[in-house]
UniProtKB/Swiss-Prot annotation:
Known function: Catalyzes the formation of methylglyoxal from dihydroxyacetone phosphate.
Native species: Rhizobium meliloti (strain 1021)
GO cellular component terms listed in the entry, alphabetical order: cytosol
Keywords recorded for this protein, A-Z: Lyase
Gene3D superfamilies linked to this entry: Methylglyoxal synthase-like domain (3.40.50.1380)
First-level EC class: lyase
Coiled coil: none
Lineage, broadest ranks: Bacteria, Pseudomonadati, Pseudomonadota, Alphaproteobacteria, Hyphomicrobiales
EC number: 4.2.3.3
Keyword presence, Nucleus: no
Residue sites binding substrate per the record: 12, 16, 38-41, 59-60, 92
Record GO biological process: methylglyoxal biosynthetic process
CDD domains (alphabetical): MGS (cd01422)
Name of the protein: Methylglyoxal synthase
């Protein structure tokens, strides 16, 4: 399955459990993807879905967001799911904006909440 599409997963602290629940509910579909994730988010998803193929990068505030951004810029990420917490101020908010900008510049689909993520993986199922 070397030609699998690559999905990037990121979640703010208050949304990590939501992303893990999303992954568990969609584990069969996600198993068809190569997944990259920021460190803590990837760990949380692996806790509930240990069979998924997830490459864990650095934690978001330590550069994981930038690592995913670099993968987007090199064409190595096909879709981005980023569960954003809009109610909590983030000291690294500029990283979020940078990822959104890269998703737009490189024209990859990006979901910011579960409803959109469900639609994205359903659409990309084939």
């Amino acid at each position: 399955m070397a030609d699998r599409k690559c999905l990037a997963l990121i979640a703010h602290d208050q949304k990590k459990d939501d992303l893990a629940a999303f992954a568990k509910a969609n584990e069969a579909v996600l198993s068809k993807w190569k997944i990259v994730a920021t460190g803590t988010t990837g760990g949380r998803v692996l806790d509930v879905c240990p069979a998924l193929d997830i490459v864990r990068l650095k934690s978001g505030p330590l550069g994981g967001d930038q690592q995913i951004g670099a993968l987007i810029a090199t064409g190595d990420v096909d879709c981005l799911i980023f569960f954003v917490d809009p109610l909590t101020a983030m000291p690294h908010d500029v990283d979020v904006k940078a990822l959104m900008r890269l998703a737009i510049v490189y024209d990859i689909p990006m979901a910011l909440n579960r409803a959109t993520a469900e639609q994205l993986i359903d659409f990309r199922r084939n």
